[in-house]
Structures are given as structure tokens and as C-alpha cells.
Amino acid sequence: MARPWNFSAGPSALPESVLQQAAAEMLDWHGSGMSVMEMSHRGRQFVQICDEAEADLRELMNVPADYAIMFMQGGGLGENAIVPMNLIGRRGLPAADFVVTGHWSTRSHKEAGRYGDAQIAASSAQAVNIDGHEQRPFTWVPPLSDWRVRPEAAYLHLCSNETIGGVEFTEWPDLAAFGAPDVPLVVDASSHFLSRPLDVTRTGLLFAGAQKNAGPAGVTVVIARRDLLGKALSICPSAFDYANVAAEHSRYNTPPTFAIYVAGLVYKWVKAQGGVQGLEAANKAKADLLYGYLDASGFYRNPVHPAVRSRMNVPFVLHDESLNDAFLKGAEAAGLLALKGHKSVGGMRASIYNAMPLAGVQALVDYLKEFERLHG
């Protein structure tokens, strides 16, 4: 029986070959007689798994040696606290700046305020007119000329792909241009991690929950410049102190072993697809197909300004919201799952991450056409 197409925003679809390999190795990993779930996190088998995952990720993202790669717990929401506990006091005055472009950067800003002075450097929380497009709040990105970054800030945080709103940064700023060359950029890249080339060297720290593009829920990837480590607040738990985690190669405490193993399988799958460059081409083709149909239709509408539309998360609304339930019921019957939009914005959302093939997006477009034919 064919599997349905899963458009969940996260946890999301994994490559089928990864699931098959994990299933085949479930009871006996490489002749060890053990499942990965049964291994000691300090035993040689898991050390090999963890180190290989780190090496593959470093290769895929061109991560220099002066950056540490850490596999942690807590998800992106946890990192909203762990980042300030590690970085906000590094320059004495606990202060950090935020670019607020949606739900997740709003939560990051609010959480950091518990640990210091968290100020908004730029925001898209208001409606604007851009090139004749009337844009609702959080459907656009503030131009760099409007950013106000304090030179004394410990870091500047942005969410480079807002999963709920479907807003994506296509490039990251050079903070020297704002007169803040000593302010490192912190990026929440959770929902477009490994979907396109990302220049880690433009950041001081990058984090990503794996459950969207890079594995199952339970492991969070943190990539941090080593010179930023070792300056955690005294209230930071030792297990969340980046200096401790990096020094022990993600094994300071018991890490999420099985999640790291599956993430490692995903990294090998990404390499087999031609790396992030190969996936970028595939993701662009999928996004072009879906946005192309939505834009041509008078029945559906994507609210995001075209210049900052996400390739990963595509929100859309029907012209008649009373049809929402019928749309979702019909979609599920057609084998198209998890298309309901986030409760904070409503409507629909198709998350078309790396593991979603073009055929899945084509199946969605075919359904969109048929539903419009019946109800338009």
C-alpha cells in the first residue's frame, strides 16, 4: 500500500530509505547484537555513530574547525533559553537584540527577556504596503536600512525561516554594516536547515531542531563559534553550558542517542542527493510548482510577500473559509495529510521539506485544482 503524503510542519516526513534502514538495523546495529537504543552513550559503537554524524554534517555545511557542532536536547524552544544563558552576559552587560518577523522570533525575544535586556532591532509586526502589495503583519521582512543594532549587544538573533508564517531570509546580514562588527549573529534555522546552502561563517551561532529537515524529534543541532563558549551565566545548568557539551563531543550527559543515529542517516541521505546544493534545486522546483499554482488561482491565496516566501512552509487560505473543513476532509481522503494551518494564523499550510518529493507536491496541486473545480 502506498504511503500518504505527509505535509506536517514537524515532526515531519523522513526519507523512506532512512526509515527502512533504521528498521533493518533496529535489533542489531552492524553486528553488535544491540539496538542503538540499547547502547551506552560512551561505548565505542555509539561514539562512532555520533562522531560520524558530526563529521558528515561538518562536510555538508562546510563548518570550519573553529566552530563546534553539538547535538543537544530541548528543541528550538529550549534553545531560546539556552542561547541567552550562554551568550547574553558575555560582554558584561546582559543585552541582546532581536529581529522579530513571526511567531518563533517573537517567542525567542520574550524568552531572552528573562535573562537580560532584550530589545527589538527590527520588526514586521505591523501592516505595510510594499511595491503595491498590502502586507499583513509578519508576512514581510524589514529592510536592512531599518535595523537598529546596538554595538554593545551580546548578539543579534533572527529566525531565518518562520515555520508558521512562511517567511524566509534568503541571505544573512553582515553586522559590520550596522556599525556592530563585534556583535555575533544568532540564527534559528530549524525549518530550512539543510534545505539550501547556509553560510555558517556569517553567524556566531546557529541552531536547528532536527524534526523538520534533519531527523526525528529529540535532538537539536547547535553550531557555535568556539570563542563564544565558556561565558555562560551562573544560573545556566551545566548540561546546557555549551563549553561543557563541546568539550565532551555532545556526550557531557546522556544525549538522545537514537535521534542522533537517525539524524546521521539523514545526513548520509542528503549527501546521496547531491548535498545541500542538490536539495536546493529540488526544493526550488517544488516551491515554484506550488506557488505558481496558488498565484494563478483566484480560489487560493498565499499572504507572504513574494520576495521572502519560504521554500519549506507554504501557508495559504481559501477564498471561502467555510470550505476549510471540507478541504481538509477531502485532502485526507486523497492521501494528503497535515495540511491544517497553525492555530495562530488559521488557513492551510503545506510543509514541503527535503523528504517531500516533487511527486508529493504535484499530488497536492492536482487536489487543489480538483477542489477548486468542485467548489470554485
Swiss-Prot record:
Binding site for pyridoxal 5'-phosphate: W104, T163, D188, Q211, N253, T254
Transferase listed as a keyword: yes
UniProtKB keywords: Amino-acid biosynthesis, Aminotransferase, Cytoplasm, Pyridoxal phosphate, Pyridoxine biosynthesis, Serine biosynthesis, Transferase
EC number: 2.6.1.52
Gene3D superfamilies the record matches: Aspartate Aminotransferase, domain 1, Type I PLP-dependent aspartate aminotransferase-like (Major domain)
GO CC, any one term: cytoplasm
Main location: cytoplasm
Needed cofactors: pyridoxal 5'-phosphate
Domain of life from the UniProt record: Bacteria
Positions that bind L-glutamate: R42
The family this protein is said to belong to: Belongs to the class-V pyridoxal-phosphate-dependent aminotransferase family. SerC subfamily.
Name used for this protein in its record: Phosphoserine aminotransferase
Lineage per the UniProt record: Bacteria, Pseudomonadati, Pseudomonadota, Betaproteobacteria, Burkholderiales
